[in-house]
């Protein structure tokens, strides 16, 4: 083995070392062996969450503006808004304590409304259907106590009864309306009955006036008081006095003695 051969071996070793360095790529050279695990641990750490201080500050400013706006309202409106805000706050706190619930289905207020609807539906199903034998006084309208409730009852009865006139005007008048007025007037005092009669008299005058106006609309030349008006006299044809009685002549007044024999020639 010569020195030249030894030089060749050194060149081969240098080439292999350069190849190993190129194979490593462009990775940075670490100062120590434990730096690579540290870098991996730092990359695996979760990123810190942004602080919610900005949102809280924004909510605080919004709440402050709402409070200032409420202070400018009248006491009654302010009291109602504060009560509503307290109720919503209580409901939201209850929802937070129960966990992440669906607002449309699981919110306490939604559940309460749904329960009320279910109870109302059950009550409607359990309510018996009205028949001819069902007492009419069981209707809620007949539980009237105040003036307004009596007025509502009167309007409901009038609307329901008047429609019966369309079915049979004869039975409506003779078998329902007249006798009904008499029956409902029996418990009243004489003064109230007189007021009822006066009310009916006013109704009579109004009906007569309406019928008179309807008749005048059909009659040409009518008057406002209901008369048919003056009829125009028919014009007589003037024949120049040819047929006047004083100008008539009688055949018996003619004297035939003046005629002679020559008159017939």
From Swiss-Prot:
Name listed for the protein in its UniProt record: Eukaryotic translation initiation factor 3 subunit J
Location in the cell: Cytoplasm
Bias-annotated ranges (Basic residues): 46-57
Free-text function comment from the UniProt entry: Component of the eukaryotic translation initiation factor 3 (eIF-3) complex, which is involved in protein synthesis of a specialized repertoire of mRNAs and, together with other initiation factors, stimulates binding of mRNA and methionyl-tRNAi to the 40S ribosome. The eIF-3 complex specifically targets and initiates translation of a subset of mRNAs involved in cell proliferation.
Compositionally biased residues, Acidic residues: 24-34
Coiled coil spans: 78-106, 190-220
Subunit structure of this chain's protein: Component of the eukaryotic translation initiation factor 3 (eIF-3) complex.
Gene responsible for this protein: HCR1
Stated family: Belongs to the eIF-3 subunit J family.
Annotated organism of origin: Candida glabrata (strain ATCC 2001 / BCRC 20586 / JCM 3761 / NBRC 0622 / NRRL Y-65 / CBS 138)
Ranges of compositional bias, category Basic and acidic residues: 35-45
MF annotations from Gene Ontology: translation initiation factor activity
